[in-house]
Amino acid sequence: MVHAKKYYLCRMMSYQCKIGCIGLVTALMICSCNEQKQPHPMSSSLSSNDTMEDTIQIYHHITLDSTEQLQIYYPHFKRMDLVCGAMPQPTDTSVIMVCAAAFTGQLKKEFSHENIAGNHVSGGVYHKGYPCKANTGAFVYAHRQWKFIYQDYAAEVAQAADESGMGFGQMMLINNGLRMPANVVGKNICRALCERKGKLCIIESRQPLLLIDFIKFLGRYGVTQALYLDMGEGWNYSWYRDNQGIVQYIHPKTLDYGTNWITFYR
C-alpha cells in the first residue's frame, strides 16, 4: 500500500494515495484550496434536464429525502459528537446516525489524534491533528448550537472544547450560499455535512459525480452551508437507525481505515 510520506500533506491534496490503497478508483483528485479564487454565488436556475423531485420519508429517528442526484439524511438528534479511535457500534442504541468526518492521514493499525487532519474536539477535549491545507473550513457544536466557519476557525474550535462540545476541520464547499474554491478532478461518491433551511443534514451523491457538480446540486437543493466529509472505501462505512431501531447500512464496512466519526445521538 502507498502511504502519505509526511503528516503535513493532506490526503485530499494527494488523494491518489488513498485511491492507490483501495485499488478501485484510479481518478487523480487535486484540491486547489491555495488558489486565489473568489467565491461564486450558487445558481438557483434549473435546466430542463435537471428536475428536482423530492421524496420525503419521516421516521422517528430520522427524516429521509432524495432528489435524482442526492440522498439526504436529517437525523432527529438531541446531541452530537466527534467520536475518535473506535467507531460507535450498532449495539449502542443511543446512536441514530454515524459517518466519517475529518480526513485521516496515514493508514495505521494504531490510532493517534495526530493522524486526523486538523485540530479537533472530541467529547469536549481539544486534540492536535496534522496540518492540512485542504481544511478551509470547520464545524463546531456545543450546547445544542452549531456553526460552520470558513477560514480562520482555530479559535472557534478551541472554544468548542471550552464549552464541552465538538468540532473538526474539513474542506468547505458552500458558505452562506456561496460556492467556495474547491477543484477536484474525477468522479466519486461525495458526502457533506450541510445546513438547509436551518436544519442539519448529511447529504450524499447517489452516483459518482465531479465535486463541482455535487456542489451545484447541493445549491439547487437549497443548501446554504456544506462541509465535505471523508469518503472512499474504508472510510465510507456509515449507518442510521430506522423506526424499529434496526440499523440500516448506507455503506457496509470493508476496511478499517477510519479514525473519526460525526455521531448523532437521540
Residue ranges and their predicted role:
Residues 5-21:
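Bacterial N-terminal signal peptides that target proteins for export
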Residues 20-28:
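Sec-dependent N-terminal signal peptides
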Residues 30-32:
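C-terminal motif of bacterial Sec signal peptides marking the signal peptidase cleavage site
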Residues 34-130, 203-204:
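Zymogen propeptides
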Residues 108-178:
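Active-site-adjacent helix-turn-beta-strand microarchitecture at beta-sheet edges
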Residues 111-127, 186, 195, 199-208, ...:
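Conserved, well-ordered active-site substructure
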Residues 168-192, 197:
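Conserved beta-alpha junction segments in alpha/beta enzyme cores
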